[in-house]
Regions:
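Short, conserved micro-motifs composed of acidic
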Residues: 87-88, 101-108, 127, 136-145, ...
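Multi-bladed beta-propeller domains
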Residues: 21-38, 67-85, 128-148, 186-198
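Long amphipathic alpha-helical scaffold regions
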Residues: 73-99, 117-120, 171-184
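Blade/loop signatures of beta-propeller domains
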Residues: 2-27, 192-194
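Short, conserved, GDST-rich strand-edge loop motifs in beta-rich repeat architectures
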Residues: 1-11, 100-122, 163-179
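Surface-exposed loop/turn positions within WD40 beta-propeller blades
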Residues: 13, 50, 58-61, 123, ...
Length: 198
């Protein structure tokens, strides 16, 4: 779990922790004091296995950390294939793949009562990362200019990738017009290939 003080405008000390349920012993996976001035996102484990997890470190020198067994790998936050950070992960049931959305997010704060904060995407695409081969699996069906693809999830059998998509709006002006479609695309776990249509 991620422990952070209440509020969302600023943060000071935060970290990702594991806790034993039998005796409540706690250990830090990482604290942001180890990466000064940066934010650590919630981590996602593969089928609740504490030895296999991923999380993203936000900031100028951020990256995405994969831990599989005894091996740790840090991926650059951006490269020529993806334009934003690797934000929302979801593991394939096999543990061989992890899907992400790559988002350029912004926050908008309201000036009226009972309206707190809106988080919106300036852009968002989806891809799958092959954990064993250390390769990005990208497709133009999941990376479009006019739409934001987001929140990818594998089906229980690992043969379908579900996600949401929406037409880009003029943010923050038209944030209330944001509507999402639920989509899916076939995924072959044996080859790491997507289907031909979404």
């Amino acid at each position: 779990y991620r422990r952070i003080a209440p509020g969302y405008e600023v943060y000071s000390k935060m970290g990702l922790y594991e806790r034993r349920l039998d005796n409540f012993d706690e250990r830090a996976l990482i604290e942001n004091t180890q990466v000064p001035g940066m934010c650590v996102n919630c981590h996602t484990s593969c089928k609740t296995n504490p030895d296999n997890y991923v999380f993203h470190i936000r900031g100028d020198h951020g990256g995405t950390l994969f831990k599989t067994g005894q091996k740790t790998e840090i991926l650059k936050a951006k490269n020529d294939s993806i334009k934003g950070s690797m934000v929302y992960p979801y593991w394939h049931p096999s543990g061989k793949y992890c899907t992400f959305s790559t988002n350029m997010t912004r926050q908008g704060f309201h000036m009226v009562k009972d309206e707190r904060v809106e988080v919106f995407d300036l852009s968002s695409d989806i891809f799958v990362y092959d954990v064993e081969k250390h390769e990005l699996i990208v497709d133009t069906l999941l990376s479009t200019k006019l739409y934001s693809e987001n929140s990818p999830v594998f089906s229980a059998d690992g043969r379908t990738l579900y996600y949401i998509t929406s037409l880009q709006q003029d943010y923050p002006l038209y944030y209330k017009d944001q509507k999402y479609n639920l989509c899916r695309i076939a995924f072959d776990p044996a080859t790491g290939r997507y289907g031909e249509k979404a």
